Design a protein with these regions (language model features):
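Immediate N-terminus of the mature polypeptide
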Residues: 1-98, 102, 108-146
Length: 146
């Protein structure tokens, strides 16, 4: 049984929902949930940024019915204008883990394994989403400011 919408990346690194037979293509993976959890911008606290007007945040969080809950992660904060130190890689892993925490709380997965490593001028991420039935891995090469 399909549980999510299929998302793919084209040669220009643009993301698209796939279409099949005139409808959104479904998948057994957690594509949309993963991408929204990572790339949706959780609002940074005032202490995390140098200027309060740079706190960002995904617009959909304005409509949350759960007080204090925001979709997304601080992934954006940990990958922009930072040096790629081992300490910052750990902060990035923590931001990703925090963004995916809701899937564990909702019983969609049982745990995550996240590893960030430096690659020529960027970051490689390995994200494993582990459920009782299967393990789904995603790999990303990210190029960020060093």
């Amino acid at each position: 049984m399909a549980i999510d919408l299929k998302v793919s990346q084209d040669a220009n690194n643009d993301w698209h929902w796939e279409i099949e037979n005139g409808d959104l293509k479904k998948t057994n993976a957690l594509d949309t949930a993963l991408y929204m959890s990572l790339f949706g911008q959780k609002r940074a606290s005032k202490d995390d940024v140098t200027k309060p007007d740079l706190r960002r945040g995904h617009f959909i969080n304005e409509f949350s019915r759960i007080e204090g809950y925001e979709i997304g992660s601080l992934f954006w904060l940990r990958t922009e204008q930072v040096k790629l130190t081992d300490g910052n890689l750990r902060l990035l892993e923590n931001a990703i883990s925090d963004g995916l925490k809701w899937m564990i709380e909702d019983g969609i997965i049982t745990k995550t394994k996240i590893a960030a490593s430096k690659v020529s001028g960027g970051v490689n991420l390995q994200i494993d989403l582990i459920s009782k039935l299967q393990e789904d891995s995603k790999y990303y090469d990210l190029f960020v400011a060093t």
